[in-house]
């Protein structure tokens, strides 16, 4: 099935998961998964959160920033900081924590998939 993100309404999510500014995305959500084309403007972030019953795969299309990643509950201060840029892929396994931060000068644009457990 082809997904035309231009035909999916853009959702504006301020302070998503406790992040800064706004996360905007075209999201296709069905009973199996959440598939999205997302954008963080410079200075915006998706807050540090846990993937309790799912995992997430993110492929970066343009821009640069950083991902904070932690495999346990020791907190954001112990998270590993990973530089991300167009062409990189970030994986957050089930039960792990992560955050995305656009600390670059351009929009950080990415494609993400989060399978939903039944």
Give the label of every model feature segment:
Residues 1-34, 47, 81-85:
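A short, N-terminal "cap"/entry segment at the start of jelly-roll beta-barrel domains
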Residues 27, 35-39, 57, 81, ...:
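Conserved hydrophobic/aromatic beta-strand scaffold that supports enzyme active sites
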Residues 36-53:
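Conserved short histidine dyad/triad with adjacent acidic residue
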Residues 47-49, 67-68, 92, 98-104:
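Short beta-strand His + acidic residue motifs that chelate non-heme Fe in jelly-roll/DSBH
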Residues 53-66, 70-72:
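Glycine- and acidic-residue-biased ligand/ion/polar-headgroup-sensing regions
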Residues 72-94:
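Short acidic-glycine-tyrosine-enriched beta hairpin
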